[in-house]
Amino acid sequence: MYRTHRQHSLLSSGGVPSFIGGLVVFVSAAFNAQAETWFDPAFFKDDPSMVADLSRFEKGQKITPGVYRVDIVLNQTIVDTRNVNFVEITPEKGIAACLTTESLDAMGVNTDAFPAFKQLDKQACVPLAEIIPDASVTFNVNKLRLEISVPQIAIKSNARGYVPPERWDEGINALLLGYSFSGANSIHSSADSDSGDSYFLNLNSGVNLGPWRLRNNSTWSRSSGQTAEWKNLSSYLQRAVIPLKGELTVGDDYTAGDFFDSVSFRGVQLASDDNMLPDSLKGFAPVVRGIAKSNAQITIKQNGYTIYQTYVSPGAFEISDLYSTSSSGDLLVEIKEADGSVNSYSVPFSSVPLLQRQGRIKYAVTLAKYRTNSNEQQESKFAQATLQWGGPWGTTWYGGGQYAEYYRAAMFGLGFNLGDFGAISFDATQAKSTLADQSEHKGQSYRFLYAKTLNHLGTNFQLMGYRYSTSGFYTLSDTMYKHMDGYEFNDGDDEDTPMWSRYYNLFYTKRGKLQVNISQQLGEYGSFYLSGSQQTYWHTDQQDRLLQFGYNTQIKDLSLGISWNYSKSRGQPDADQVFALNFSLPLNLLLPRSNDSYTRKKNYAWMTSNTSIDNEGHTTQNLGLTETLLDDGNLSYSVQQGYNSEGKTANGSASMDYKGAFADARVGYNYSDNGSQQQLNYALSGSLVAHSQGITLGQSLGETNVLIAAPGAENTRVANSTGLKTDWRGYTVVPYATSYRENRIALDAASLKRNVDLENAVVNVVPTKGALVLAEFNAHAGARVLMKTSKQGIPLRFGAIATLDGVQANSGIIDDDGSLYMAGLPAKGTISVRWGEAPDQICHINYELTEQQINSAITRMDAICR
């Protein structure tokens, strides 16, 4: 049961907690009356002496002075939820919210425009209506909303989605550890195949100390026939530089790919952080699409490093949740099918035309050493600087430079906002390079980008671009190669089996590159997308080509999708083509359902079908069933059966996933080639967070996280999450918070134990990047008691206020027959009851509850006030 303790409670004659209708009506009337109102005590009791002092209500006061947790609404928009101190301004003016200049400024009121604010202390209560004409402050007691209204001219002019830096929270000091373990045990019955086991562990550890974030990403892997290997992928120290709207990084990171190709480095970088901008000023992230012909492992790499790995079912897939390390630069996508075959292709990614709003400056400065995972490249020092400036008339000017021992490059560009015709940008890069054979080269590269959304047609040209480079143009990465040609091998690769996708030849420099990304909404008929790229090279006719098409629609409950994928890379003997048809049909109406409404919302069941055909005419077909179980929908299973026309073999899989409060677990089994190849796979992921209040286990961490602290509210669900609940101490970690944005963190009051009440069920936080922000919930674990009070055999006065000693927020009001309802009471304590300001207008109730009374839904008892 949820109850706000800062709001006093009354009892109806039936004993159910509520406000006495008569008092509320008359208090409300008094609050809104223009003339002074007087309460006749005889209205409430025949004996006026049995009524408490109601003079405060005669002045229109609905509440007593104190701190109340309220929603703050500015011009009909909720801007914050926090504790506000209500004080008595003067006996004549009564009680009002104490709003300071500092708090009003944080809400978005333009206090600088009114000189009177500067004459007040920043912590002094502001008479808002006296300073800003037509301003008003109203407290809605029933909804606990502090409603502030000011003229629009007194509001700061901010972009949509803007959150002022004053509300950004650096978080608490903590030690963080995220882990992800996966393993597979394979059995191959054929003589030419080896059975084997493989294991992979990814550890993301870190320390938060004030605004500083220390992070390390390491992996451990072991396969049959190979020794175990640890890899340190990256380590860095990072912090936000709020005055510069930027971020300082010391250690391993990537440069942005807006101007020059993105490269991995180890060094120092100071760069603008677009996350600090409102959503309306931010760009887009890459989406990786493809088609799997079987239960496949998807690996996404950048600069030789694995940045993303997952398993997908047969059919079309889409990955849109890549980490920020892969926010620029081309991505290598590898699809490893169940039979061991690997299909790989490159997904180009560039930002939309590099436009900035007028006056906006975006910068990046890097002093570092080139970092690579390839044994074919050296690690040399380099420097890079870039700058963008939003000019007048919808223009953006940008440029940058790169400097290394064997490389010099400078670029300059200009972007235009063409209004209804979209946005374009054009830039040129001049480079001088010295290659591995000591040959010197000079060249230029020209790039054109275009983006446009046709709202009335539902068409989005998310990105159309073309780059042309002369034969003498090379990139910084090209000058890092130790040889003019060869095969790249990353640490741990089998050098006896080179892959065509790893071959490089500096003689074949890049020439022209065209890329297109178009999506179209068709209303009730669905939507389709078309994306493609083509890279040509000097001194060869070979090309890299990627073309993807997809159409998705909904026919009543049936979801239908069609997709086609074509990829051909330089050096690849033949192109890969896959056509796929998939559909899913919900089965909820056919399966037994829970009567619980909460469970019904969380449980789903659907049938899936995937059919794919490759360019050689081989067909794979899969039919599956997927269902979510348990009250929170955090247990799911999937069963699939398939057929492959190549070899006329059957395949199948079964898996189960459990998303728990302290970890996520998965186990699966699949077979192929009529059972001659079998595999058992399993995974476990989660986190451990050490902080000043203890150690908390949780689900996998995101970049930014929230620590819920609700002592007394153990095993309570977190709203809008799956499987997440507080531990035995009332703590849990909510992962994947959005940095520099308002995050609404809420506990599900319906899952509270019956002897627990929450003072606040919702906390709003605005974390900085990488922060672990504390969201505190005040839970009162204790008994709910209905007391029949008396003093010297006479019921206590109607309207008297009762307060639990030591807990000012926990209080109640005596009703018309002397009854008092209070919740969250400890087993033993003292309640003070006051019906006036005189020293003799107070008495005390000493009580002691049994264990049975504490655990009861409500306890009724007589109480003597002395």
From Swiss-Prot:
One of its GO terms (molecular function) is fimbrial usher porin activity. InterPro entries: Fimb_usher (IPR000015), Fimbrial_membr_usher_CS (IPR018030), FimD_plug_dom (IPR042186), PapC-like_C (IPR025949), PapC-like_C_sf (IPR043142), PapC_N (IPR025885), PapC_N_sf (IPR037224). GO terms for cellular component: cell outer membrane. The keyword Hydrolase does not apply. GO terms for biological process: pilus assembly. It comes from the Bacteria. Keywords: Cell outer membrane, Fimbrium biogenesis, Membrane, Signal, Transmembrane, Transmembrane beta strand, Transport. Pfam families: PapC_C, PapC_N, Usher. Belongs to the fimbrial export usher family. The operon is cryptic under classical laboratory conditions, but is functional when constitutively expressed. Part of the elfADCG-ycbUVF fimbrial operon, which promotes adhesion of bacteria to different abiotic surfaces. Could be involved in the export and assembly of the ElfA fimbrial subunits across the outer membrane. This is Probable outer membrane usher protein ElfC. It comes from Escherichia coli (strain K12).
